Amino acid sequence: MDFLNSSDQNLTSEELLNRMPSKILVSLTLSGLALMTTTINSLVIAAIIVTRKLHHPANYLICSLAVTDFLVAVLVMPFSIVYIVRESWIMGQVVCDIWLSVDITCCTCSILHLSAIALDRYRAITDAVEYARKRTPKHAGIMITIVWIISVFISMPPLFWRHQGTSRDDECIIKHDHIVSTIYSTFGAFYIPLALILILYYKIYRAAKTLYHKRQASRIAKEEVNGQVLLESGEKSTKSVSTSYVLEKSLSDPSTDFDKIHSTVRSLRSEFKHEKSWRRQKISGTRERKAATTLGLILGAFVICWLPFFVKELVVNVCDKCKISEEMSNFLAWLGYLNSLINPLIYTIFNEDFKKAFQKLVRCR
């Protein structure tokens, strides 16, 4: 996104020399982040394209997100690095307009993709049967197209207002002199998608938790109706033990109290039932914790990366007396860019199919 920079023309040669190590460090660090973002998103895109098992409408949204984040890495980050290191814009206003357009559009599109993915997952859980019919490649394509169209509509007005004021040739920024422009762009690009994502993921977690409990209760109810409360292996084992035990007793001692024998068998079954119930509770608890962890990572990364930047954009541009340093402004912008590196990691790291696809790509199989 846009941020302020100052010219270094007034600095002496000695001052520039003293600042050189820090500039080199910043340049290498940011270049490393850009390279990592490019590589990881490329892997996600390649994995989805070449792996037939990943050809699913839900993964098309992931692929489109990866394409968007890839564009941020190759079209936005490099220009930003040059701008930060040089401390002035040297590529002319035409390139500046193109860079700002791509910057705002791609960053907005990346955020809106997260909303689309949240909506897709919400419908897949809460309306599984009906949505399974609608969840087609065409449907995914329509969602992706809508996301890009909305992103363009959100990003274009700030660029139009940019040309209403005068800009120096050595700077490439959007001056938010219009409060309406600031509110429109920040709420459209972040605050509204954030509210939507928070609501959807809260409902997803509640729905998933309820679904686990219903399935668990349904399995137990079915087994109790059938008179079975054991795992298949445990059931066979118990039948074998109880049958041989009864047969042995009946042959060796005709006066055996069979009520006691059946009591022993019931006791064994009760123990297996308790063990099975405990195992299921453990599995259910593990699933819920995993779901909570995944959702927590998704929301946490998104909020940590983008919230500071958009708070700054809203406060600084609405409040005339509020100022922020150039270094902090740059840091907040790159904290937002960092989300393009984190996105492919979070959305694929918990998926075994993606892990296997990555391994095949790395091994060139």
Swiss-Prot record:
* Record membrane topology: Multi-pass membrane protein
* Cellular localization per UniProt: Cell membrane
UniProt motif (DRY motif) ranges: 120-122
Name by which UniProt lists this protein: 5-hydroxytryptamine receptor 1F
This protein's UniProt keywords:
Cell membrane, Disulfide bond, G-protein coupled receptor, Glycoprotein, Membrane, Receptor, Transducer, Transmembrane, Transmembrane helix
Provide the residue positions that the database annotates as binding serotonin: D103, C107
Q: Where is this motif: NPxxY motif?
A: 343-347
Briefly state the protein's biological role.
G-protein coupled receptor for 5-hydroxytryptamine (serotonin). Also functions as a receptor for various alkaloids and psychoactive substances. Ligand binding causes a conformation change that triggers signaling via guanine nucleotide-binding proteins (G proteins) and modulates the activity of downstream effectors, such as adenylate cyclase. HTR1F is coupled to G(i)/G(o) G alpha proteins and mediates inhibitory neurotransmission by inhibiting adenylate cyclase activity.
Family membership noted in the UniProt record: Belongs to the G-protein coupled receptor 1 family.
One Gene Ontology MF term: serotonin receptor activity
Q: Record's superkingdom? A: Eukaryota
List all topological domains (Cytoplasmic).
Answer: 50-59, 120-139, 203-291, 351-365
Please name every pair of cysteines joined by a disulfide bond in this record.
C96-C172
Gene field: HTR1F
